[in-house]
């Protein structure tokens, strides 16, 4: 009697979801279940391809029960079961994203307020600059109330669902289009293909969800007017769309889009470049299979790449803030040069410290939430969110 255990439907679907949502280094799903031992051997690379807040090597728990001798030719899971599993993963991933984003929302709002305070001062919505993260928290709670720290979070949570759906739609297409392999085509072709596919997929997804990011930014920076008893500029998410379309048209919702696409490529280039260079040097010997070492390295590299590309984020958000204003930046280059000329280079990094705190808070919450899911459901559903 054949003692080989064949994978269950759920295990096959878990393998498909894992392959479709991780690094370009993994092959696309071709309809057959491949030996999980292959992926376990390659687990050291690509664990942080989506974000530092995702649990590294989280997906391997679902494949651990499948023996490495599993048959390479198996009957595919029925479509309805596959969709059901996908829907559960998608929705639970949304809950996970909502939990982490909501927990870190106060830090995120403070980051955006500090980052865009100079534009707010120009428009009369801020009387004086913030002295730091603590001062921003204190003044925001005093002037607007504790609940205002979550202003703009709804748009940020909503943004997760179309982003993930679009990522599933675009990622495999561009992965096949730029199908370079490191061992076959060499490092630089693989690296260039990784940048191209990631940038193209990111820009394609961004085209559909950018207006939500714009609305989130405007709501988060909508502090009450500096004058006593001042009112807010926007009454909610729908009001942002209505007023922006009335004053600037569709272009107002997409101000800063071009530089955002550049930012995706710059970030991915820095991230994969640093990770691929540092991992073989630092994670050696006993450190190679260390969860903690992998997590710390991924977190440090993610924050390093985010810090290096932070000026691009500042420029795009400062451009967003000019929608509805009489005076606007002519282009991202004009915005960059004006900020440097009038405010100095330090202004491009305002709020960067909050970014690091946000990553810590999000990672801590997700770690706890993952543990809760293991207890309740027996598996983890990652947020995958950007």
Swiss-Prot record:
GO (cellular component) term, any one: mitochondrial inner membrane
> Can you tell me which residues bind ADP?
159, 171, 316
Q: Which UniProt keywords apply?
A: Antiport, Membrane, Mitochondrion, Mitochondrion inner membrane, Repeat, Transit peptide, Transmembrane, Transmembrane helix, Transport
**Where does the transit peptide lie?**
1-76
Q: Which Pfam families match?
A: Mito_carr
Give the membrane topology.
Multi-pass membrane protein
Q: InterPro entries from the xrefs?
A: ADT_euk_type, Mit_carrier, Mitochondrial_sb/sol_carrier, Mt_carrier_dom_sf
For this protein, the parts annotated as crossing the membrane are: 86-113, 154-178, 187-207, 257-278, 292-312, 352-372
Record's function text: ADP:ATP antiporter that mediates import of ADP into the mitochondrial matrix for ATP synthesis, and export of ATP out to fuel the cell. Cycles between the cytoplasmic-open state (c-state) and the matrix-open state (m-state): operates by the alternating access mechanism with a single substrate-binding site intermittently exposed to either the cytosolic (c-state) or matrix (m-state) side of the inner mitochondrial membrane.
What subunit structure does UniProt give? Answer: Monomer.
| Listed name of the protein | ADP,ATP carrier protein 1, mitochondrial
């Amino acid at each position: 009697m054949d003692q080989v255990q064949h994978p269950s439907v759920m295990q096959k679907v878990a393998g498909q979801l894992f392959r479709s949502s991780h690094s370009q280094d993994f092959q696309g799903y071709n309809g057959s279940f491949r030996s999980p031992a292959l992926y376990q051997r390659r687990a050291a690379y690509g664990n942080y391809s989506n974000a530092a807040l995702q649990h590294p090597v989280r997906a391997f728990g679902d494949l651990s029960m499948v023996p490495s001798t599993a048959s390479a030719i198996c009957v595919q899971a029925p479509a309805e079961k596959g969709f059901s599993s996908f829907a559960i993963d998608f929705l639970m991933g949304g809950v996970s994203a909502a939990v982490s984003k909501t927990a870190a929302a106060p830090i995120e709002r403070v980051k955006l307020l500090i980052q865009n305070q100079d534009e707010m001062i120009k428009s009369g919505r801020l009387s004086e600059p913030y002295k730091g993260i603590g001062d921003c928290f204190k003044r925001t709670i005093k002037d607007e109330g504790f609940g205002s720290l979550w202003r703009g979070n709804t748009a940020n949570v909503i943004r997760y669902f179309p982003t993930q759906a679009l990522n599933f739609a675009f990622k495999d297409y561009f992965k096949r289009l730029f199908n370079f392999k490191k061992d076959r085509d060499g490092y630089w072709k693989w690296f260039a293909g990784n940048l191209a596919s990631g940038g193209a997929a990111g820009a394609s997804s961004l085209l559909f969800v950018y207006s939500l990011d714009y609305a989130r930014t405007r709501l988060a920076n909508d502090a009450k007017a500096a004058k006593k008893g001042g009112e807010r500029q926007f009454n909610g998410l729908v009001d942002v769309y209505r007023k922006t379309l009335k004053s600037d048209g569709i272009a107002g919702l997409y101000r800063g889009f071009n530089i955002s696409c550049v930012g995706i490529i710059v970030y991915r280039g820095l991230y994969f470049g640093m990770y691929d260079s540092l991992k073989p040097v630092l994670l050696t010997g006993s450190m190679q299979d260390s969860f903690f070492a992998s997590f710390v390295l991924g977190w440090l590299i993610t924050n390093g790449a985010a810090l290096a590309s932070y000026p691009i984020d500042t420029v795009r958000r400062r451009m967003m803030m000019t929608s509805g204003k009489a005076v606007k930046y002519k282009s991202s280059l004009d915005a960059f040069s004006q900020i440097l000329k009038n405010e100095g280079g330090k202004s491009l990094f305002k709020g960067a410290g909050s970014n690091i705190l946000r990553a810590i808070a999000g990672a801590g919450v997700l770690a706890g939430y993952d543990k809760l899911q293991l207890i309740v459901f027996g598996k983890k559903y990652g947020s995958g969110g950007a």
